[in-house]
Amino acid sequence: MENEAAVFKVLADPTRLRLMVLLSIQGETCVCKLAEALNAPDFKISRHLGIMRSAGLVEARREGTWMHYKLSDARSKLEKCLQQCFGECLATHTTVKADLKRLSKANCK
């Protein structure tokens, strides 16, 4: 139960929950685009993604100066269920719709 509790602890933060939803819908995405989507500075998004990475929820890939993140493969039935729910259940949430709209217009500089 410790691993499951740790997942919920990480996702209890609204910013990290929004990041999980965006990554479940959009797939691999650059930090700068995620920052634009959430109207937050890059360093704040990077910090949240670092916490999520430490918990095994996301993976990172460097491309030059850019860091790209995607959801990790689910390690348990719980994680698989949550990933599906993020993409299906929360995609129509008002906040997520606004995030997706900003994400579609985001442009790394």
Regions found by a protein language model. Give the residues of each.
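A general structural signal for well-ordered secondary-structure junctions
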Residues: 14-17, 29, 58, 96, ...
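Amphipathic alpha-helical dimerization/coiled-coil segments
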Residues: 2, 76-109
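Alpha-helical residues within the helix-turn-helix
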Residues: 36, 53-54
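Beta-hairpin "wing" of winged helix-turn-helix
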Residues: 54-63, 70-71
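N-terminal helix-turn-helix DNA-binding core of bacterial DNA-binding proteins
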Residues: 2-43, 66-76
